[in-house]
Amino acid sequence: MLSYETNARIQELRDKFENIKTTVDVDKIKEKLSRIEKELSDPSVWSDQRRAGKLGQQAQALRSQLDLLNKVQELFENIDIAVELSEEDESYLENLNELLKEAEDMVKEFELNILLSSPYDAYNAYLSVHPGAGGTESQDWASMLLRMYIRWAERNNYKVTTIEEQPGEEAGIKSATINIAGPYAYGKLKYEAGVHRLVRISPFDANHRRHTSFASVSVFPEMDDDVEIDIRPEDLKIDTYRAGGAGGQHVNRTESAVRITHIPTGIVVTCQNERSQHQNKATAMKILKAKLFELELEKKRQEKMKLMGEQKDIAWGNQIRSYVFQPYTMVKDHRTNYETGDVQAVMDGYIDDFIEKELLFFASIDEDKE
């Protein structure tokens, strides 16, 4: 006979899945998928490779939702069979526990899939990191955050492309922007935007004192070309400069790197990874468009955080998460109150629990879907 704990675990998992299912309109998902597949079957759509790629990405995301739903339902059927067998023969209990663990992981994944249902959640993401005041220490912290997100992206099998990276004078980075490509990259990362605080004994302090450093993270969706954003030429200041890595590595002899300032908002974007000034300008304009679009989304949602190219006042006031290395180890999100003592795992990109808690938190306060 199954223990009370096992029965309660099964019932809790089943109730959670049924509650999530009530938020899913399967017919609507199938209808949308059918419409996209019909469009993709038209040979003319492939004349625009970018649009075809976006449609393919949307179709992949919808199929993923349907496949996951079917897999979880099949898993519960197998659990029911395992329960019957376990009541007759306790040797089947191990198999039942394995199925329950698999079901818990799948229900968690399904829940995230449903939470990521805003129109732009399925898009690729741009992610920028900027250090706060504090020189080398904060610049090193910014590079640690950048590494954390790259590791997270790699663990999710996302493609990471560096758009621009300006190395610090002694260590770390002065700024960096990367593109993270994959299903729901933006939806998963959008609430990572904000100020991240580090407390540690600085390796750059000869007296080994404890330092507090800040760095800001901005996240914005990679927009389709057909999304219209009004950008007036007279509102732009465009500068060019020589691109190159730290220590004079791979220095470009021509001024191919581009910096664009959007004067009305103060947003600044740079790009130096392309081969020509023309390509860098095109990429920078695309990023500017994405930032302006995200800024409008933020205003509509009436959220406190604002995504700006130049992060101002990166300090205590608007921090979202603290990372404490000494005198104890803890990472704590100040919005959800979720925390863990395994700082090293977090810095190695294991931040899915934080992302899940963020999505649940903002869903619980009934954030308006765009």
Swiss-Prot record:
Keyword entries, A-Z: Cytoplasm, Methylation, Protein biosynthesis
Main location (coarse class): cytoplasm
Entry keyword annotation includes Protein biosynthesis: yes
Protein name as annotated: Peptide chain release factor 2
Modified residues (N5-methylglutamine): Q249
Subcellular location: Cytoplasm
Function field: Peptide chain release factor 2 directs the termination of translation in response to the peptide chain termination codons UGA and UAA.
PTMs per UniProt: Methylated by PrmC. Methylation increases the termination efficiency of RF2.
Lineage of origin: Bacteria, Thermotogati, Thermotogota, Thermotogae, Kosmotogales
Entry GO terms, CC: cytoplasm
Organism in which the protein naturally occurs: Kosmotoga olearia (strain ATCC BAA-1733 / DSM 21960 / TBF 19.5.1)
Recorded name of the encoding gene: prfB
Presence of the UniProt keyword Cytoplasm in the record: yes
Molecular function per GO: translation release factor activity, codon specific
InterPro entries: PCRF, Pep_chain_release_fac_I, Pep_chain_release_fac_I_sf, PrfB
Similarity remark: Belongs to the prokaryotic/mitochondrial release factor family.
